[in-house]
């Protein structure tokens, strides 16, 4: 059966193909028919008309396909041109952004601008000095990163609970390792009695309580223990702070009582040749006389006056100045 066949030609983008020649194909077909049918004119005219119609239809369809393919090529080319234009526009926008960033960087606040100082009337030396600002190029210095060891704090971890599963001793005796509290004596043990006295001296307790006095058996053979006891008590009294007494009345300072007497008063006492040991008076009167000579006030209660008197005596006795005078006299 004779069915019309449409010839299609695929045209790629980068190739140019010429349009098929319809006249050449028509002439070739007529020559073939003449050779095969001879002088049969009617059949020849009929076939010529059929071939002509078929060739015209084929040519029209091929022309339509060529037009559609050319339109596609034109559309594709226009799209490529549009893409190129878009890329150019993007590059222009990027350049504009870079220029704007550069302008923003140049317009940073505080940057030296020589145009701001052109109107100043200064000497040439000052102008040369300002030119060094533009000549200066900062150096890029890469700082070395020094690694320091990070040692975290030691945090002890809680271990497992001891299940007391111990390996028994081979001799069968109980092993109290970790269960028995041992009271091992130190090299120099302190005496409980001396320690109690030291604590009482530090706490300044006024209430009396029972004290267990240490006793020694065969003391004549334990001379070392007796010497240690005497030494510890002497150290206790040496380090013991002096007692503090709060006077109910106003009393002068010891430094004021130790001040030198006036010369007239010393001369009068030396001329009188007063001997206090030969005075015939009571103890109260004797205390009043001595306190009056030393400028110590006496109130109704003489205990505070006597305490100040004996404190003054200890100060004179322990004074290095009077010790040197006694050594010179002797």
Swiss-Prot record:
Region: Disordered, residue numbers: 1-21, 55-112
Composition bias type Acidic residues, residue spans: 7-16, 80-101
Disulfide bonds: none
Alphabetized UniProt keyword annotations: Cell projection, Cilium, Cytoplasm, Cytoskeleton
Annotated localization: Cytoplasm, Cytoskeleton, Cilium basal body; Cell projection, Cilium
GO BP: any one term: intraciliary transport
InterPro entries: Intraflagellar_transp_cmplxB
UniProt biased composition (Basic and acidic residues): 68-79
Keyword check for Cytoplasm: yes
GO cellular component, one term: microtubule organizing center
Pfam families: IFT46_B_C (PF12317)
PANTHER family per UniProt: INTRAFLAGELLAR TRANSPORT PROTEIN 46 HOMOLOG (PTHR13376:SF0)
Family classification: Belongs to the IFT46 family.
Function: Forms part of a complex involved in intraflagellar transport (IFT), the bi-directional movement of particles required for the assembly, maintenance and functioning of primary cilia.
The name this protein goes by in its record: Intraflagellar transport protein 46 homolog
Organism listed in the record: Schistosoma japonicum (Blood fluke)
């Amino acid at each position: 059966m004779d069915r019309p066949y449409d010839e299609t030609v695929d045209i790629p983008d980068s190739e140019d193909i010429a349009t098929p020649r319809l006249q050449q194909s028509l002439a070739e077909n007529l020559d073939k028919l003449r050779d095969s049918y001879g002088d049969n004119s009617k059949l020849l005219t009929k076939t010529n008309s059929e071939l002509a119609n078929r060739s015209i239809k084929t040519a029209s369809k091929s022309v339509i396909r060529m037009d559609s393919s050319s339109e596609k090529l034109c559309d594709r080319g226009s799209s490529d041109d549009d893409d190129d234009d878009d890329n150019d526009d993007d590059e222009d926008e990027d350049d504009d952004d870079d220029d704007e960033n550069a302008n923003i960087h140049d317009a940073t606040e505080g940057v030296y601008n020589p145009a701001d100082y052109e109107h100043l009337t200064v000497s040439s030396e000052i102008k040369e000095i300002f030119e060094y600002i533009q000549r200066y190029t900062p150096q890029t210095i890469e700082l070395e990163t020094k690694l320091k060891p990070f040692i975290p704090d030691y945090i002890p971890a809680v271990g497992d609970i001891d299940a007391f599963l111990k390996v028994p001793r081979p001799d069968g005796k109980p092993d109290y390792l970790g269960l028995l509290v041992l009271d091992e004596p130190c090299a120099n043990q302190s005496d409980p009695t001396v320690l109690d006295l030291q604590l009482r001296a530090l706490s300044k307790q006024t209430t009396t309580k029972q004290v267990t006095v240490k006793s020694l058996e065969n003391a004549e053979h334990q001379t070392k223990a007796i010497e240690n006891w005497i030494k510890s008590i002497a150290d206790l009294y040496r380090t013991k702070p002096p007692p503090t007494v709060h006077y109910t009345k106003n009393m002068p300072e010891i430094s004021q009582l130790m001040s030198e007497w006036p010369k007239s008063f010393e001369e009068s006492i030396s001329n009188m040749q007063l001997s206090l040991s030969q005075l015939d008076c009571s103890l109260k009167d004797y205390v009043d006389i001595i306190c009056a000579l030393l400028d110590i006030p006496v109130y109704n209660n003489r205990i505070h006056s006597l305490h100040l008197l004996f404190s003054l005596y200890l100060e004179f006795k322990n004074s290095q100045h009077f010790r040197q005078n006694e050594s010179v006299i002797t």
